[in-house]
């Protein structure tokens, strides 16, 4: 969703549905892109996080395989036209599952290769998770575009403040 109001749900109520969709999708993506690392990211990957109730997946590939992975994913999923599209990031969506799905195709080591690190920081830092949840609660029912801008600022600040958070090792 790129417009309208932000609506959040209790992640514990949708955890089983998200897990089932992720496992099914992980198998499909692994068959399609056997050299990719496939990670459950986003709020539903973080116990206690406030979420919109969707599933976010990060597909990490080497830069040399990015264009081919992008082509293969574009044959099977809709492009998320509201998201950035660069030489190292492509976004896709799938509304046909039990929960909405967003897929971020990311080149390892590229400028957008921070999704797994952000997930791990949220899992490891109660303080960062609480700040993230507070931001989300503040934006509940308000502009989605403005929320995305503020969320990006918070993520950038938190990652800069925690430079020793382990990078993705896949």
Segments (PLM) and residue ranges:
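Helical scaffold of the NTase/Pol beta-like nucleotidyltransferase catalytic core
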Residues: 1-39, 170
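Conserved short hydrophobic interaction patches
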Residues: 32, 72-76, 121
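Active-site nucleotide-donor binding segment shared across nucleotidyl transfer reactions
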Residues: 26-68
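Metal-dependent nucleotidyltransferase catalytic core
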Residues: 8-26, 61-97
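Catalytic cores of NTP-dependent nucleotidyl/adenyl transfer enzymes across multiple folds
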Residues: 111-170
